[in-house]
Amino acid sequence: MKPDQQVLGSIPRFNPIHKILGMMLALPLILVSQGVPAAAGDLDPDRVKRGKYVVNSAGCHDCHTPWIMKDDGPGPDMSRMLSGHPESLVMPPPPKVEAPWVWIGAGSNTAFAGPWGISFTKNLTPDPTGLGSWTEEDFINAIRLGKSKGNGRPIMPPMPWRVYRNLSDDDLKAVFAYLRSIPPIKNTPPSYQAPAAP
């Protein structure tokens, strides 16, 4: 018997199978400690239900779900629920905004122009083009601090993060759980465009 295979009771030490099993058992703990998002099936149904209530009450669909004209007037296109500004909808330059007007919005209700530049609503679905790589902590920090994940750029108007940052931790966790539970939609909205130099 080789020195690295000494017997401890009846279990050989450093057996390759045991190494593999040990790594497989440790992987979930490592991923949780690294902040990897939970799978939708791991979500608490009561928390998801609460999150849906907050999302619907806070008006998230008003901007993050593209609007279309319906028989009874404009409304959210729920087939693209919370997927942000459609990547296929290329916006022309916005018309000039003159005082006392401050900002304008696109008919889709997903693109807005004002003194801050042009902002496009984010995909909030769990797709990789949306919040797929976000952790609960990333989401809460974005809402509390008004900073986009990754580049730390300020979240632009009209996103009312200054209002939403007053939600409780439990409510923000519930919103994130709900967003993790909805169908992923592949859609990469355009990036924010800073205002043109005068």
Explain the meaning of each model-derived region.
Residues M1-H18:
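N-terminal secretory signal peptides that target proteins for export/translocation
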Residues L21-V32:
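Bacterial N-terminal signal peptides
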Residues V36-N56, I68-K70, S133:
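Electrostatic cytochrome c docking/interface patches
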Residues G51, S57-W67, F139, V175, ...:
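The canonical Cys-X-X-Cys-His
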Residues S133-S148, W161-P190:
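C-terminal capping alpha-helices of c-type cytochrome domains
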